[in-house]
Swiss-Prot record:
Gene3D superfamilies for the chain: Cytochrome Bc1 Complex, Chain C (1.20.810.10)
One GO cellular component term: mitochondrial inner membrane
Protein name (database record): Cytochrome b
Binding site for heme b b566: 68, 167
Complexes and interactors: The cytochrome bc1 complex contains 11 subunits: 3 respiratory subunits (MT-CYB, CYC1 and UQCRFS1), 2 core proteins (UQCRC1 and UQCRC2) and 6 low-molecular weight proteins (UQCRH/QCR6, UQCRB/QCR7, UQCRQ/QCR8, UQCR10/QCR9, UQCR11/QCR10 and a cleavage product of UQCRFS1). This cytochrome bc1 complex then forms a dimer.
Cofactor dependency: heme b
Length: 267
């Protein structure tokens, strides 16, 4: 229950490693992006495994972060204001990273997801439309959008790593929380071998279901629509995000007014 911080660290390391390997074979161009992902899966040694681990690793990242936040809420970790606030920034940065990453394969749901979510900024009075066109780099989601999304997806994980160090620095100021909410000083034990072995056990227990998912049901959490290359002329019957954003999308769609939905989501 107290392990999810270390699991998030290993998730981040795994995602950066698999992501760098994928970036080596990816082409950030609307005409080539979809083909380059297919090429990675078909022709690159273990490319299919790297892609499956990266896609499902994102799901595990969100499972761990939601449990980590849930535990923090239950045990009052929000009282450590600096640690909590850096954690909130980390969550938002992670969501931004996952969103721009989902656009990169340039499948149908990638394209339409990018169109729908970036369009939300147009709900801002006066400057909204200008912001959207500035983000797109034109009058629709196109090549400039994909290029800048790839840049952001490459950059943001390193920003997350930096924020994680700040998060841990603030945590070390107060010491770790515990179920009783009292000082942990009297319970301090050597990091090695106790915590190191505990973390290795946690990593093993997380990698087992991740590998099972990546090897036996790699597309279980994905959208079949994304196996179709992006087509700006055909809207998918249901535009929906990955499971880890469904709560946000539900808030957004629960109010029948664009600005109202955006405000509810922001709140």
């Amino acid at each position: 229950w107290w392990n999810f911080g270390s699991l998030l660290g290993i998730c981040l390391m795994t995602q950066i490693l698999t992501g760098l390997l994928l970036a080596a074979h990816y082409t950030a161009d609307t005409t080539l992006a979809f083909s380059s992902v297919a090429h990675t899966c078909r022709d690159v040694q273990y490319g299919w495994l790297i892609r499956n681990l990266h896609a499902n690793g994102a799901s595990f990242f969100f499972i761990c972060i939601y449990l980590h936040i849930g535990r923090g809420l239950y045990y009052g970790s929000y009282l450590y204001k600096e640690t909590w606030n850096t954690g909130v920034i980390l969550l938002l940065t992670l969501m931004a990273t996952a969103f721009v990453g989902y656009v990169l394969p340039w499948g149908q749901m990638s394209f339409w997801g990018a169109t729908v979510i970036t369009n939300l900024f147009s709900a801002i009075p006066y400057i909204g439309q200008t912001i959207v066109e500035w983000a797109w780099g034109g009058f629709s989601v196109d090549n400039p959008t994909l290029t800048r999304f790839f840049t952001l997806h490459f950059l943001l994980p390193f920003m997350i790593a930096g924020l994680t160090i700040i998060h841990l620095t603030f945590l070390h100021e107060s010491g770790s929380n515990n179920p009783l909410g009292i000082s942990s000083n009297c319970d301090k034990i050597p990091f090695h071998p106790y915590f190191s072995l505990k973390d290795i056990l946690g990593f093993t227990l997380m990698f087992l279901p991740l590998m099972t998912l990546a090897l036996f049901a790699p597309n279980l959490l994905g959208d079949p629509e994304n196996f179709t290359p992006a087509n700006p002329l055909v809207t998918p019957p249901h535009i929906k995000p990955e499971w880890y954003f469904l709560f946000a999308y539900a808030i957004l769609r629960s109010i029948p007014n664009k600005l109202g939905g955006v405000l509810a989501l922001a709140a």
